[in-house]
Amino acid sequence: MLQQQLTTLLAQTNIALTEKQQQQLVRYVELLTKWNKAYNLTSVRLPEEMMVKHIMDSLVVAPHLPGHHYIDVGTGPGLPGIVLAIALPNTHFVLLDSLGKRVRFLMHVKHELGLDNVTPVQSRVEEYQPSVKLDGVLSRAFASLQDMVDWCGHLIDHSGKFIALKGVFPSEELESLPTGVKFEQKIALEVPNLDAQRHLIILSKD
């Protein structure tokens, strides 16, 4: 049932996934549903809702990530990082969260799905020092743009990007950006079967 739902949703996008990738996404939803009962990882309880509100909502970002190394800050149960790692197997994602239960779940998902391109890390973002040069910092429902820039500025250099997944276009947040950061691009995202606005906001160091 989940497989059929995913196939139907994908048909409404330009995203092409292999059968293996689709199976990995379905298995991820199954694992999230199972672990959620004990660990309370997401307020979305039904797997059919997760497929739209979590999987597709994250997946539509994949075509807009040209780099090879990203960090997903405040990843929670792996959103968008796990989904993007499945869709982009040649891109590496550090999945950062401060809560041990979330990181334990991510380690289980990594092992269960054979995701060699993810590195779950338990740490506060302010204390984390990347071991490789990162192309971008990803955040979804993590913080305001100003907080994201303040907390994550040490993770990238001038060639890196701040990439925020937002709902309604955050015009007020953009007006209060700190000096040294510039707004580069906004991308309106279409999420199948989701009746809500979604925007990708891309910032860089000035």
Curated annotation (Swiss-Prot):
Disulfide pairings: none
Location of this chain's protein in the cell: Cytoplasm
Family: Belongs to the methyltransferase superfamily. RNA methyltransferase RsmG family.
E.C. number(s) listed in UniProt: 2.1.1.170
CDD domains the UniProt entry points to: AdoMet_MTases
Record InterPro entries: rRNA_ssu_MeTfrase_G, SAM-dependent_MTases_sf
Residues that bind S-adenosyl-L-methionine: 74, 79, 125-126, 140
Keywords: Cytoplasm, Methyltransferase, rRNA processing, S-adenosyl-L-methionine, Transferase
The protein's name in its UniProt record: Ribosomal RNA small subunit methyltransferase G
A cellular-component GO term for this protein: cytosol
This protein's record includes keyword RNA-binding: no
Chemical reaction(s) catalysed: guanosine(527) in 16S rRNA + S-adenosyl-L-methionine = N(7)-methylguanosine(527) in 16S rRNA + S-adenosyl-L-homocysteine
Source organism, top-level taxon: Bacteria
Pfam families xrefs: GidB
